[in-house]
């Protein structure tokens, strides 16, 4: 795995900011980076047809291991591997067995990335856990685009659904197999504020 990581020629979590977001910022584009936490490729394919009004270029990204949020999402925003984050920013790293949230420093990691690549772009960071938060964000979207070069949005519903699938008998019944899980994802997306 270590050798494979050293010589990969495809995009991984920690490459996204450098290879995809940074070039857009350098071209003066205003960027909304929307991250669906715990979102699988088959779920993406299920909702993709709902987005035909948009010009979408699909570029696959391979996740680092482990894929747990604290590693994968922090790597995405920092533009570096978790071991590098822990070494460079020990105050922002939370050990796996710690009780507190492992993603409290995502805005700091985004700012640190921008500082490392010598960008003075303004950015905003939003974590969406409920419909009213999504509606509020949408109401402010035009203003955010005017004010910031980069707007980062983390949508947590899929992650909450995934956890509920293992913890709740009712959700297990609704998403009893992979096809049902994709269907539930699609239904949520169609009726969500972000669709």
Can you say where each PLM-predicted feature lies in the sequence?
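Feature captures the catalytic ectodomains and active-site-proximal regions of enzymes
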Residues: 1-195
């Amino acid at each position: 795995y270590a050798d494979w990581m050293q010589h990969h020629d495809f995009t991984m979590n920690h490459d996204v900011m450098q290879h995809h977001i940074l070039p857009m910022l350098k071209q003066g584009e205003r960027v909304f980076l929307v991250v669906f936490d715990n979102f699988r490729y088959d779920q993406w394919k299920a909702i993709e047809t709902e987005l035909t009004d948009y010009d979408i270029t699909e570029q696959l990204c391979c996740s680092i291991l482990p894929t747990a949020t604290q590693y994968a999402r922090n790597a995405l925003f920092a533009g570096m591997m978790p071991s590098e984050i822990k070494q460079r920013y020990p105050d922002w790293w939370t050990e796996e067995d710690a009780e507190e949230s492992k993603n409290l420093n995502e805005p700091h990691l985004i700012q640190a990335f921008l500082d490392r690549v010598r960008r003075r772009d303004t950015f905003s960071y939003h974590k969406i856990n409920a419909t009213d938060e999504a509606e509020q964000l949408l109401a402010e979207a035009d203003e955010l685009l005017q004010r910031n070069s980069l707007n980062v949005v983390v949508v947590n519903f899929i992650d909450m659904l995934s956890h509920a699938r293992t913890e709740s008998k009712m959700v297990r019944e609704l998403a009893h197999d992979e096809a049902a899980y994709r269907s539930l994802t699609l239904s949520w997306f169609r009726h969500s504020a972000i669709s």
